[in-house]
Amino acid sequence: MQYQGKPEYFARELARLAAEGVRILGGCCGTTPAHIAALRAALDALPGQLPVAAAAPIPTAAKPEVETDDAFLRKLNAGKKVIAIELDSPKDADLTGYLDGARRLQAAGADLLTIADCPIARARMDSSLVACRVHRELGLNVLPHMTCRDRNLNATKALLLGLYAEGVREVLAITGDPIPTAERDEVKNVYQFNSRKLAQYIVSLAGEGREMPSPLTVFGALNLNARNFDVELRRAQEKLQNGMSGFLTQPVLSAQAVVNLKKTRETLGEKAKILAGIMPVVSQRNAIFMENEVNGIHVDAEIIERFAGLDRVQGEELGLEVSVKAAQAAAPYADGFYLMTPFNRIALMERLIARLKDEGIAD
C-alpha cells in the first residue's frame, strides 16, 4: 500500500503543522522513504526554534445521568402488591386520546403502564416511543414491550439506549407473534434473538465501561395456560438465568391457571417477581373468541356460560366480578397484577383498580 499523495505535498502539510506546535510527526504504512526524506528536509528549512503548543486541558469524564426514582420497582421490592395495566398504543398518529386514558388510569392508582409492541404483528404506534412520551409528560412508570420480530441487533441497541436516555428503566422482552403468512411477501420477520437471548443482551449493556451506567430491569412473559406447563416453567427458569427479573402472565381465567401460578411460585421462589394477568371478559362472544382464537388464553366453560344473554352493562358487571375473584385467587402467589384493558374501556379498568384496592387485594 502506498499513499497517492506526493512526497512534496506530504512534507509541506506536516511542516505546516510543525510550525503550529505539533512536536511528533511521521507517516503511516502508506508512506515511503521518499515521503520521510522530504519531510526531514522541510523541517530543517523551517526558521528558528519550533514553537511548542500549549497543552490542552484534559476533559474530565462526564458523570452518568442521575438515576431516576423508580417508584414502581421501589413498591414492588417492598413487597406491596403493584398494579400494572396494559393499554395498546394507537393505530394512527394521534396520541391525544391515549394520553387522556393513561392519565385516568394513573389517577385511579396504576403503578405502571405497559404498552404492547405491535400485537398480533399488526403495526401500531411504536411502543417505546409511546412509553417515552407517557413517562415524560405524566411521570408514570412505563414498561414498553420489545419483540424480537422486527429489529436486528443494531436497531435493538439503538432503541434501548434511547429508552435509557428518556428515563425508562423497565422493558418486557418477548419473542413476538410472527408475521401472518399472507403478509410475508411484503413484511419480513427478523428474529435475530429469542426472548432469552434478548434479555441476556439487554443486561449486558450495563456496567462499568459499558453503554449504560445501570441495568434495565427486564421482565418476560409466562403462559399459565400452556398445555405442557412443565416445559413453560423450565423456560421461565432459563429466562431468569439470562437476566430477567420477573414475569407478566397470561390471563387467569381458569382453575388450572391458578394451580399453575402456585406451582410457579413454589418452583421459582420469591426472587422472581410475578404479576398475575387479569383480563376482564365483557361478553359471551368475547369469552368464546378468547377461548378459541387467542393463543395462550383458556377460559373455563363455566365462565363462558355465565355471560349468556347479558347486555353490555350486565356483561361488564359480571366481568368485573370474575376479575376480582381471579385476582383474589392469584394474590397468594403473585407480587401484583397485570391488568389488560379490553376494547379500550378505561372506565371499566378504573372500577377494577378501585375494587382491587378497596378490597385489599392490591396496595
Outline where the language-model segments fall.
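Domain-level signal for soluble alpha/beta catalytic cores
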Residues: 1-363
